[in-house]
Amino acid sequence: MSPPGSAAGESAAGGGGGGGGPGVSEELTAAAAAAAADEGPAREEQRPIQPSFTKSLCRESHWKCLLLSLLMYGCLGAVAWCHVTTVTRLTFSSAYQGNSLMYHDSPCSNGYVYIPLAFLLMLYAVYLVECWHCQARHELQHRVDVSSVRERVGRMQQATPCIWWKAISYHYVRRTRQVTRYRNGDAYTTTQVYHERVNTHVAEAEFDYARCGVRDVSKTLVGLEGAPATRLRFTKCFSFASVEAENAYLCQRARFFAENEGLDDYMEAREGMHLKNVDFREFMVAFPDPARPPWYACSSAFWAAALLTLSWPLRVLAEYRTAYAHYHVEKLFGLEGPGSASSAGGGLSPSDELLPPLTHRLPRVNTVDSTELEWHIRSNQQLVPSYSEAVLMDLAGLGTRCGGAGGGYAPSCRYGGVGGPGAAGVAPYRRSCEHCQRAVSSSSIFSRSALSICASPRAGPGPGGGAGCGGSRFSLGRLYGSRRSCLWRSRSGSVNEASCPTEQTRLSSQASMGDDEDDDEEEAGPPPPYHDALYFPVLIVHRQEGCLGHSHRPLHRHGSCVETSL
């Protein structure tokens, strides 16, 4: 029976002449999509590991039990040797008028057999005590069934994390006390000086992640029914999906400890993470049916084997038949993907849109500088990109933004108008070409004239440029200065579009001093600033044209070919 609200909705939809059917289906589809979005991406599966015999020995060797067992076996061997072995003895007795008497007897007949027996009894007592300690540890283990483990894992995944910091300010106070000492039977009193720790201030704080958000990225624990027993270990950890979330964590942490650092002579810093409203247990053992465990896990079988000095083989068998699983409860702070902070506050900047998406999470590390440097190198938000990163940038979206700016001046359209119609026509051609490989260079700063020539849709003939499909050559950047000529040169080929850029890149080192002077005259003005280095054009090298049919020596770099005349 449906609730009144649902019934009213159905009657209203029916009165509308059947027009509410598609609306209801759309609402159901939207609700299902929202539920799927709430569930998040599919989790990875984790299964318990069944160890081999050697790994089970290395994991838990029980060396004390093994050593005591070997010593007891040695004592039993000595007693058995005393009863089995016979030696020939020669004695002289006055009853036989001074004649010698030879007979066979045990080597331990004179009471030597009691020595290994005493050692055996002592070792057996120590052995039973060690077995009692082992059984007590097993009894203290938290034994649960498989369904309880699943429920506990689900609660830990849904639990709210709390990263806490604690600062304890303290100092030491010099105190004295009277103690009584004894020397040569005489008692005398002396003064002892000691230092006592005094805590003066205790402060606690938590990480406020309301702005960056958090979600659980733990794996799904499956396959617990396949093993007779599974030993589980749970650990808690956290990571960051964006540098903004990590910077927020580090800033709050540094601010908290900085506020409490100078309150006293010393400060003890503690930090950790706990899950709210969850009884966290690090170790537990899961059975399909805890009321009926395997025979080797019963206490009666354990004590029977212990009395027969067979406790160590039983323990090895139990370790071999027990599966192990180390489960990490991981919480991810921050939103996945590039520009999490900017997406929450507004649109992306042009430089952020050109950056590749973030594909790896940033784990929590102890060193702050290395994490920030790794992020800056990866995202390239504050460092000037290299040539290989500049050629991978998508200029089509940049050209669209520059073309739609109208007559106004845009910073991204400087140095030759990268977003002009020529660049818009070049981008589809580059995407459709399957044989093109982008050239790689670690240091190249483009000049103003080179960029204007490259971005010009229809440059006239002259020393600095030519027709769209002509054979002009121009300098894009200087690597070693004016005295050592090593220039990137490009020669355009025949393509379908008239405004296409060059299709072959060559590295020439045979320029003379006259060429250097011409290049110096051509490079009028200083190089572009760092901000404009993000909008450099793309150089393309054809694998077939650049590698075959030339007498120069080819240089291969990551699948592409750059000609050089060494």
Swiss-Prot record:
Keyword Transmembrane part of the UniProt annotation: yes
Keyword Transmembrane helix (UniProt): yes
Residues passing through the membrane, by range: 65-85, 112-132
Compartments where located: Membrane
One GO cellular component term: membrane
Record field: compositional bias (Polar residues): 495-512
Start-end of Low complexity biased regions: 1-11
Topology of the protein relative to the lipid bilayer: Multi-pass membrane protein
Broad class of the protein's primary localization: membrane
Annotated Gly residues bias: 12-23
Top-rank lineage group of the source organism: Eukaryota
Region annotated Disordered, chain positions: 1-25, 495-529
InterPro entries in the record: Tmem151
Keywords assigned: Membrane, Transmembrane, Transmembrane helix
Pfam families, A to Z: TMEM151 (PF14857)
Comp. bias (Acidic residues): 514-524
Family, as annotated: Belongs to the TMEM151 family.
Designated name of the protein: Transmembrane protein 151B
Species name: Homo sapiens (Human)
Lineage, highest ranks first: Eukaryota, Metazoa, Chordata, Craniata, Vertebrata
Gene for this chain: TMEM151B
